[in-house]
C-alpha cells in the first residue's frame, strides 16, 4: 500500500497525452552496456573498432553467451547490493528501471570525433535516480514537466536520461492481447496507466524528452548526428518490446513473446518528413528536445528481434499531430557495428538491437569520408531527401537509391550520360557539322554533300534510319541529316560545337534517352548560343543553308570575241547546269519529297526560271553589291556588256532585283525562305494531286520567313512592314519571269535562225511547259492583290 500511495502522489506529466515517463532506480554503482544499433541509419566508426574488426566472428559469437550470463549475474547482485534502496519504488518498478539502466549505460567510450558541426551542449538534466520525494516535488503545479529537467538535480553516474513517449493503450482488452500470458501489466510494473483522453487510439507524439546532459570525460567528444523523425508508434512499440524481452532474459519464469519480426522495409514507412517543409529542430546544430542514446560495443546478433505482435503498417495508426512542435530524434553514438538484415543478405538481427528503418543492406552503399572520418551513410535516398533537405545538401547526391532497380537504370549516379547520334541512334563520337552524330553518319553526310550523288527513295520517303538499317536508304538518311541541322561548313564554328556538346550532355541528364521524333526540338536547343556571339538560327533555316547549291561556272571563254549568239549559247548551258542543281536542291528541301512525284515535276518545271533569276540577283547583291549581273564567276555582265547584248531590256529588268536586295538589305535567312517559297509560287489551274500537303508546306515556309524577319527586326510593326516589303518583292517576280519566259520561247523557236544552241533538257522543258505558262494555264500564287 505504501508503494501504491507513493506512486499516486506523483502527478502525471502533461507534456503528452498517453505518455509515461520511465525513470531509473535511485542509485546505481555501475551499469553494463548492451549493443543498440540503428541499422541502416548511422554507422560511426572509430580507431578501436578497426582493431576489433580483425577479430574472428566465431570468437565474438562465443563471447556473447558469456557476456550475457555475466550481465544477468551482475544485475542479480545489484538487486541484493546494500546500496540498493527499495524505498525508491516497488520491486517490479525497480526491476523495470534496472532494465532501462542496463540498456542505456555505456561501459567505456571510444575515440572522440565529431561530424556535423558543434558539440552537444552540456545542459544539466533530471537524473533517473530521483527518489519519491523529488518526484512528489515535480508533481507540483509550478514544477517543470518531464520535458524540462531540474538543473540542480544530481547526475546518475555513467548514464544519460531517457524520456520515451509511449502509446496509450486503448483498453484492457487490447492490453491483454498485446502482452504475453503472465507478463505484468503497466500497473504491476510500478507505474500507473494513463487515460488516452480525447486522443485515445491516436499516436503519442514521439520523443518530447528533455535535453540529455552529457558529461564527457577527459578529451571526450560526442557525435551529434541528427537522424530522421520517427513515428510515435515505432517508439512506443519498440519500448514495449525492449521491456518485455529484457524481463524474460532476466530470469523470469515467462518466456519471451513469440512475435513475428517485422521486416526492415516496413519500418521505413514510419518515418515522416516535417509537415511544412521548414527547417527541423536539429538544423545547424541547435539543441532541441531529443531522444539521446549512448551505446558502445561490437557484436553480431544471433536471433531475430521479436517486435510487434503482428505485422504493422502505417495505416494501423493515426497520423501524429502536425500543428504542434515537430518531434525530433537525436542520437549520441559510439562504436556500433551494423548488423546485417535478415534474409538473403546475412543473419537476422538480435533482440537487443533496434530495428533498422533502411530497406537496403549497408553493403550496397559506398562509404563516405566526411571531415576526415570514414563513415557509411545508409539512409534511403528518397526518405533522406524528403525528410532532411537541410542535412548537408552537398553530400545528398552521393546517397544511392535504396532499390536495385534504380541502381540498374540506364544512367546510374556515378556514370556520365551516353551521347546518342541524332541520325541513327548509335553512340555519338562528337559534334560533327553542327550536330551530335556518330562517325558513320559524319562520313556519309560529307560524301553525300561533296559528291554528285542523286539519291532516290524506293519507298515513300519515310524509311526507318537506325543503326541496323541506316545503309538501306541513303536518300532518307541524307534527308534526316539535313533535318537535324547538319551543315557542311559547320565545322568552322569550333566554339559553337563545344557549346553544343555541353548542351547535349545537359539535355541527356534531364532526359535519359532522346527519341527519334524529338530530333527537331533537340536541334533547336542545340542551336542556341548563350553568349550571343553566334545568333540564334531556327533549325529549318539551318537546313536551308546546308542544302544551298554551290556556285556553278558557265564555262564561258572571255578570250574570244563576244557575239550575241555565243553569249546566249553560254547562258543556255549555264541554265542547264543550274537546272540540275535546282532538281537536286528540291529533293533535299524538307517537305518537298512528301508531295506526289507528278507534283514535284510540275513545280520544278513551273518555277525553275524564277529560282535561277532570284539566285542570280542574290549573287549580284552579295559579290558585286548589285552593280552588275553575276550569272557565274566567269560570266559577269556590267552595264556596258548589257548594252551590247541582244536582250538589254531584259538585263535592265533583271538588274532591278539586286538593287532591291541592296535597298532592303535582305539577309541570307530571308533569302533562303523566299527562295523556297518561289518553288511553291505557281501551280496548275486544276491544282495539285497532293494539294493539302502542298498548302501545309507553303504555310510552314511562310512561318519560317516570319522567323527569319524576327531575327533582325524588333517589334510587331517593324516585322509587319518587313514582311510586306519582302512579299511584294516575291509577287513582282511573276512579271519578270513572264518576260523571261516569252523571250526564251521566242529564242527557242528561232534558235536555228539565231544560231543559238539549246541543251536537250532545256529544250524538253521549254517545249512542254512554256506554251502552257504563257497561255495562262497556270495559277500564280500572290501574297497581295494587284
UniProtKB/Swiss-Prot annotation:
InterPro entries: NHR-like_dom_sf, Nucl_hrmn_rcpt_lig-bd, Nuclear_hormone_rcpt_NR3, Nuclear_hrmn_rcpt, Progest_rcpt, Znf_hrmn_rcpt, Znf_NHR/GATA. One of its GO terms (molecular function) is enzyme binding. One of its GO terms (cellular component) is cytosol. Phosphorylation of Ser-529 is sharply increased upon progesterone treatment, whereas phosphorylation of Ser-210 and Ser-259 is modestly induced by progesterone. Ubiquitinated. Ubiquitination is increased by progesterone and represses sumoylation at the same site. A zinc finger (NR C4-type) spans 421-441, 457-481. CDD domains: NR_DBD_GR_PR, NR_LBD_PR. Residues 1-95, 110-212, 252-279 are annotated as: Disordered. One of its GO terms (biological process) is regulation of transcription by RNA polymerase II. Keywords: Cytoplasm, DNA-binding, Isopeptide bond, Lipid-binding, Metal-binding, Nucleus, Phosphoprotein, Receptor, Steroid-binding, Transcription, Transcription regulation, Ubl conjugation, Zinc, Zinc-finger. Residues 1-10, 186-197 have a biased composition (Basic and acidic residues). The modification Phosphoserine is found at residues 210, 259, 529. It holds the Pfam family Hormone_recep. Residues 1-420 are annotated as: Modulating, Pro-Rich. There is a cross-link at residues 7, 294, 385 (Glycyl lysine isopeptide (Lys-Gly) (interchain with G-Cter in SUMO)). Oviduct and bursa of Fabricius. Residues 532-766 form the NR LBD domain. Residues 48-79 have a biased composition (Acidic residues). It comes from the Eukaryota. There is a cross-link at residue 294 (Glycyl lysine isopeptide (Lys-Gly) (interchain with G-Cter in ubiquitin)). Residues 143-154 have a biased composition (Pro residues). It is found in: Nucleus; Cytoplasm. The steroid hormones and their receptors are involved in the regulation of eukaryotic gene expression and affect cellular proliferation and differentiation in target tissues. Belongs to the nuclear hormone receptor family. NR3 subfamily. Composed of three domains: a modulating N-terminal domain, a DNA-binding domain and a C-terminal ligand-binding domain. This is Progesterone receptor. It comes from Gallus gallus (Chicken).
